[in-house]
């Protein structure tokens, strides 16, 4: 009596590597699972001394190979390219026991029609290479999610196989601890020997034991253990240079990848700057056009306002107003005509201002010329009013004793400051001093002669006193 049991085993390091490679990818990703399928026959005895044989198959996943470009292995119709698949897997085709598919932004771990087609093609291709049955070829679906604070990462996974009934059924997974082995599924110390392996190639430990040719019957167990330890240390020391070379190759590749990333980043930055520069030029050009259009609009508005003001002025002036009926209104104005009218108006205003200023200058000149009188007229002018008692004498000195004032005049207290102020005001407002040296005086009356001489003398003294002040 025999029944079958299928189990998938994987180490913690291999499972962590699988999750890490999927999370660090940008989008969806696929790849292959490397390992071997082990078949065990476990014999048990019942209470009635019946022997029961149980066949257990353990599919041990040891490593993974990721494929960044899924379209590299198959075309748009989901048919795989066997030549490209061989070039991608190379010498690891005998270790392929399944494939995986990682999807982002989804919580559904079910196979699509595309996944089913790819699974059948991969199983038929690799089962003929490594001797593994198509029923034991695995499919692993994975997804990942993070919490709101990005502090917790959640991973979901399921292993499936295609059974004989044509359906995909899930397979239980067991994660091996450091002290466990893939063959000891129950955690016991008893290590069964596999009856059949999917891979015929021996591992490193088997090669090491075979190279020693130990005779267990003749050599003590302690001595054989010491020989195995020394051989293992020698093998590890021989692997150090190979590991160093591989690490150097990896470092060189990482350096090249970093340089390519920097180059791509600089190209993208230059492209962005170029686009931004073009956008800035477009924006500046658009702003200039907008400013120009705004200036044109404002000038048009000003022209319309000038035209409206001119119309209002024409309406207010009776001589220029004309009766305009509702049917005679102008529908639109000519901008050029408005500009010409405003320019002509400004020119006329400037000419009128010039004429007014010229008239004012002419009036001031006439005023000064009219105000210039001869000395006899000044001397014969009466200071007091005619008919008054004090108007007997002629001259400026007579009648000083009178304190009568004409109506409208005010009494001002004379101070040195005010006299100085009046003198400065006289200098600034009065016309230039006249030279009375050549003035003709009539000799008819002695009073007039004496007054003219006094006036002439005082005027000369005044001119002499003002001469040093004019700098």
From Swiss-Prot:
One of its GO terms (biological process) is cell division. Disulfide bonds: none annotated. Keywords: Cell cycle, Cell division, Coiled coil, Cytoplasm, Cytoskeleton, Mitosis, Nucleus, Ubl conjugation pathway. Residues 343-445 are annotated as: Disordered. Residues 7-161 form the MPN domain. Signal peptide: none annotated. GO terms for cellular component: cytoplasm; nucleus; spindle pole. InterPro entries: BRISC_FAM175B_helical, FAM175, MPN. It is found in: Cytoplasm; Nucleus; Cytoplasm, Cytoskeleton, Spindle pole; Cytoplasm, Cytoskeleton. The keyword Amino-acid biosynthesis does not apply. GO terms for molecular function: microtubule binding; polyubiquitin modification-dependent protein binding. Residues 359-370 have a biased composition (Low complexity). Residues 245-272 form a coiled coil. Belongs to the FAM175 family. Abro1 subfamily. Component of the BRISC complex that specifically cleaves 'Lys-63'-linked polyubiquitin, leaving the last ubiquitin chain attached to its substrates. Does not have activity by itself, but the catalytic subunit BRCC3/BRCC36 needs to be associated into a heterotetramer with FAM175B for minimal in vitro activity. May act as a central scaffold protein that assembles the various components of the BRISC complex and retains them in the cytoplasm. Plays a role in regulating the onset of apoptosis via its role in modulating 'Lys-63'-linked ubiquitination of target proteins. Component of the BRISC complex, at least composed of FAM175B/ABRO1, BRCC3/BRCC36, BABAM2 and BABAM1/NBA1. Within the complex, interacts directly with BRCC3/BRCC36. The heterodimer with BRCC3/BRCC36 assembles into a heterotetramer. The BRISC complex binds polyubiquitin. This is BRISC complex subunit FAM175B. It comes from Camponotus floridanus.
